[in-house]
Amino acid sequence: MFAMSEPNTTERLAEALCRLLPQTQCRQCGFDGCAQYARAIAEDRAKINRCAPGGKKGVEKLAALTGHPALEIDSEYGRELPFAVARIDPKRCIGCRLCHSACPVGAVSGLPKHLFAVIESSCTGCGLCVCACPVNAVEMIENGHVWTTEDAARAKADYERTNARRKASAEQRRAQLEKATDNKSAVLMQALLKAKSLKKS
């Protein structure tokens, strides 16, 4: 059980809880990711039984750390299922890229207006791409794999790397937009000054 009297308890508890979560980043718990859910538990804003991918064993680990009773998975947030990976039907894929954008760990590869595919070894089975696909080209396929702590660690690293890349890309687009806006403003100002000078002459 976590020592609640230690300094920076909430932060340290949230980190410890996060390490016990499967890192699928599925959002079934109602939060944006595993870290956010872990923090909510640490701050007593959420119960420990919202993580369906973690299953009964996951709840037991969270219970042991927090001292809370090991409740059954709350069915409102899903149910424990065998691990499954996403697979895209190439005959249905329209290349819209929505699955790529939805994947929290960068496991979907392809080019806009071309076919996309799932890198199954990187897939966490979150199912977010299934929800994002407008033509039902994505399905979840059970493959007999049992999710491990090593898988969780790899998924967490993939998630953080994907997040960093997307933030950098968004920042670059913002900078480009600002530059384009500044250039347009400069051109407009030059045109106005030229118009004024022509009127004076």
Where in the sequence are the language-model features?
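Short, electropositive, low-hydrophobicity segments enriched in small/polar residues
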Residues: 34, 110, 129
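Flanking helices and flexible, charged tails adjoining ferredoxin-like Fe-S electron-transfer domains
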Residues: 5-7, 77-81, 120-201
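Long, charged N-terminal interaction/targeting segments
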Residues: 1-71
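Surface-exposed charge patches
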Residues: 61, 101, 131
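Ferredoxin-like iron-sulfur electron-transfer modules
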Residues: 11-23, 45-53, 72-95, 100-101, ...
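Generic secondary-structure signature for well-ordered alpha-helical cores
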Residues: 43, 64-71, 98-101, 193, ...
